Amino acid sequence: TDDKNIFTQLLSGLSCLLIDGYDRAILIDCRTYPARGVSEPEKDKVLRGSRDGFVETLIFNTALIRRRIRDVNFTVEIMQTGESSHTDIAICYMKRRVDENLLKKIKDRIENLHVDALTMNQESLAECIFPHKWFNPFPKFRFSERPDTAAASILEGNIVILVDNSPACMILPSSVFDIIEEADDYYFPPVTGTYLRLSRMTVSFLTLFLTPVWLLFMQNQNWIPGWLEFVKLADDMYVPLIFQLLILEFAI
């Protein structure tokens, strides 16, 4: 009986059956979805594990996750946003494991969105529900194009958001340590996966702190300990500090 809902479903591809003398419309879902084949993501390949990835069709993406989680507690809630686009959004989570406060916060933010369309799919949604702040440059979520990564995150109690027309998902909450993880870590033995994560973490910290420490030592050379004397220039020659920093960045 809701004309707006009927028009929205018709524009989404459903068939509408009207019967003379009956004051309701019957919506029939007999549509097919134009979609590309399921293949491994180009930017998220693994040495071991499955070779499938998300596509641009929301119903296929939820099926790829459901294939891995056959549990009654696995929940998929469909929402819509966008005055013109009416973009479908799927919120996937596990009951009894998810943070209920975070889930309610995300659903409230999506329901209160007032946008014309999500032109850039999940990127537009991310900017709307989690706007960037200058004093917090770290991301609050991470993206993945792999259904096995999404399924593993859901089983850990995280929330996965799928947006129609997007071949990626948003996983939240997220921390700095989640960003340095890769899908291969789940397929290797625990010792190997832990070693790989620690290696990436060490390189990340060195990249972040080595340059300012170098600058501090070059401006205060009397602070350099004896076992680091080799970093000093052996000959009395002038090398601009900017070139030293550039060489250090290339070395890292």
Where is each model-derived feature located?
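Hydrophobic, membrane-inserted alpha-helices
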Residues: 248-252
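Cytosolic regulatory modules rich in charged/polar residues
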Residues: 1-244
